[in-house]
Amino acid sequence: MNYTETVAYIHSFPRLAKTGDHRRILTLLHALGNPQQQGRYIHVTGTNGKGSAANAIAHVLEASGLTVGLYTSPFIMRFNERIMIDHEPIPDAALVNAVAFVRAALERLQQQQADFNVTEFEFITALGYWYFRQRQVDVAVIEVGIGGDTDSTNVITPVVSVLTEVALDHQKLLGHTITAIAKHKAGIIKRGIPVVTGNLVPDAAAVVAAKVATTGSQWLRFDRDFSVPKAKLHGWGQRFTYEDQDGRISDLEVPLVGDYQQRNMAIAIQTAKVYAKQTEWPLTPQNIRQGLAASHWPARLEKISDTPLIVIDGAHNPDGINGLITALKQLFSQPITVIAGILADKDYAAMADRLTAAFSTVYLVPVPGTPRALPEAGYEALHEGRLKDSWQEALAASLNDVPDQPIVITGSLYLASAVRQTLLGGKS
């Protein structure tokens, strides 16, 4: 297979399985020599912020001299971004070879059991674990797909577990309450393994407290055990002070905006420090400073054009939209235009309501390239917004009607990805 055929093969697997357990991926991993049982891992979950935190953790540990694998989803520009080593995406040739190897293992299993198969995410996760072992990374930072306990990534014993926050999202899979969702996410907490979390809402904190009581895990919580006592905008980024029991690190800079990124970066620092302590690896304040300064993360309040001023953001649930609105009010004193595309399996009504209440000009558009896109009929019910056939049409209307207003495109990482690929290069 060539590269295009390889990516098409990966996407040919079913998206969901009838049962949410680890039997399929463990069977495939066993056929690959159980790479997930070898090496060191950091496991990261959370409704929002897990990608930003995982990215920053990897950058900080890379700055300390470690070779770091990073497994995330979804990709923004190219599939290869999902499996990176020292922030270099897996090369095309390496991806082709790795997929061929994992495919051969899968086909051997299917010769023994004709109806055996895995989901797309299970295949990619097994691929990531195998590739990281082949490249002998020092540590791999693994971002959960959805939830935690039954997620395909949850087949490892990490050095440290991370839970950024708990909010309502993926309710059909995880449940309709904070408590239910928190129980899924707390499923990555392992016996005796430290866990670093955000300042969780009370219902989620109660779940984690009960979990660590049974696992005997050390629990390090934002705003209790570590904090950001001081922060301010610094260009299109932030400068802040981090504090924990070891003292303060001042004037840290990160190229990310939004108050919630202060929490994510603090979680990343604390996680890296816990990892270093657990593995007796030297980690200096300068490593932390250098790693955070490099922690750009695409499609997270990312400015992709100055003239016109265009920002893309992957906020995809009501909690994420709340954080986005707060950040935009801090960033801009003038009116802004919002272009929002939301998936049908999200709480699109609440998201659209919050955006239209906060901003006078909101265009609603379909998310391209995914069967999960909200159909036009769903948008028509949201009468406050202006329905457009595409984000390109909404962008053109905004540039024509209010050419001097900043434009923010949000609602889904899939939409942010499509916009970024088109405006910054890649497929149209």
UniProtKB/Swiss-Prot annotation:
Signal peptide: none annotated. One of its GO terms (cellular component) is cytoplasm. Its EC number is 6.3.2.17. Changing residue 151 to A: 220-fold decrease in catalytic efficiency with mTHF as substrate, but only 4-fold decrease in catalytic efficiency with 5,10-methylenetetrahydropteroyldiglutamate as substrate. Coiled coil: none annotated. Optimum pH is about 10. Keywords: ATP-binding, Ligase, Magnesium, Metal-binding, Nucleotide-binding, One-carbon metabolism. Competitively inhibited by adenosine 5'-(3-thio)triphosphate and beta,gamma-methylene-ATP. One of its GO terms (biological process) is one-carbon metabolic process. (6R)-5,10-methylenetetrahydrofolyl-(gamma-L-Glu)n binds at residues 75, 82, 417. It holds the Pfam family Mur_ligase_C. ATP binds at residues 49-52, 264, 300, 313-316. Binds 2 Mg(2+) ions per subunit. InterPro entries: Folylpolyglutamate_synth (IPR001645), Folylpolyglutamate_synth_CS (IPR018109), Mur-like_cat_sf (IPR036565), Mur_ligase_C (IPR004101), Mur_ligase_C_dom_sf (IPR036615), Mur_ligase_cen (IPR013221). It catalyses: (6S)-5,6,7,8-tetrahydrofolyl-(gamma-L-Glu)(n) + L-glutamate + ATP = (6S)-5,6,7,8-tetrahydrofolyl-(gamma-L-Glu)(n+1) + ADP + phosphate + H(+); (6R)-5,10-methylenetetrahydrofolyl-(gamma-L-Glu)(n) + L-glutamate + ATP = (6R)-5,10-methylenetetrahydrofolyl-(gamma-L-Glu)(n+1) + ADP + phosphate + H(+); 10-formyltetrahydrofolyl-(gamma-L-Glu)(n) + L-glutamate + ATP = 10-formyltetrahydrofolyl-(gamma-L-Glu)(n+1) + ADP + phosphate + H(+). One of its GO terms (molecular function) is dihydrofolate synthase activity. Its cofactor is Mg(2+). Mg(2+) 2 binds at residue 170. Mg(2+) 1 binds at residues 73, 143. In contrast to many bacteria such as E.coli and Corynebacterium spp., L.casei cannot synthesize folate de novo, and requires exogenous folates for growth. L.casei metabolizes folate to polyglutamates of chain length up to 11, with octa- and nonaglutamates predominating. Kinetic studies are consistent with an ordered Ter-Ter mechanism with MgATP binding first to the enzyme, folate second, and glutamate last. The order of product dissociation from the enzyme is ADP, folate product, and Pi. Involved in the conversion of folates to polyglutamate derivatives, and likely functions in the retention of cellular folate pools. Catalyzes successive MgATP-dependent additions of glutamate to a pteroylmonoglutamate substrate, with a high preference for 5,10-methylenetetrahydrofolate (mTHF). Thus, metabolizes mTHF to the tetraglutamate derivative, but longer glutamate chain length products are not observed. Tetrahydrofolate (H4PteGlu) and 10-formyl-H4PteGlu are poorer folate substrates. In contrast to E.coli FolC, this enzyme does not display dihydrofolate synthase activity. Belongs to the folylpolyglutamate synthase family. This is Folylpolyglutamate synthase. It comes from Lacticaseibacillus casei (Lactobacillus casei).
